[in-house]
Regions:
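Single conserved hydrophobic/aromatic residue that forms the stacking wall/gate
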Residues: 110-119
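Active-site histidine-anchored catalytic micro-motif
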Residues: 1-111
């Protein structure tokens, strides 16, 4: 059994849904793992991880609109405003999604996800 770990950062243009699929598969390509279980973890309280369709950009736009409607910025319900009107909504969105994913990995470089999916 082999265990390996890897840490990376991504730059974003603010709130949104971003793919890290390429970064994860690039790292897997450097490993000598024929099969296993990949755990992806984000150590942040106002960000999260999703596995979602990546073929139709409307899916990501619809998800973004849904979360904006479900948890709007600046809602007077929120007391926590110290880091801006979007911070508490980000914490709530993170609580509604996931901070960790477990994905089967095979063939050295491929996640066992359909080709239209992305992390």
């Amino acid at each position: 059994m082999k265990q390996a770990e890897f840490e990376f950062s991504i730059s974003t243009k603010g709130r949104g849904i971003y793919s890290i699929h390429k970064e994860v598969e690039d790292w897997m390509g450097c490993q000598s793992i024929q099969s296993g279980l990949l755990t992806v973890f984000i150590p942040h309280t106002s960000a999260s991880l999703l596995i979602q369709e990546n073929a139709d950009p409307d899916v990501l736009k619809d998800l973004d609109r849904f979360f904006n409607r479900l948890v709007p910025d600046g809602d007077p319900l929120y007391d926590h405003q110290a880091e801006g009107p979007d911070d508490m909504p980000a914490h709530i969105r993170s609580a509604l999604t996931q901070t960790q994913l477990s994905i089967p990995a095979v063939s050295y470089t491929h996640l066992t996800l359909p080709t239209i999916y992305s992390v």
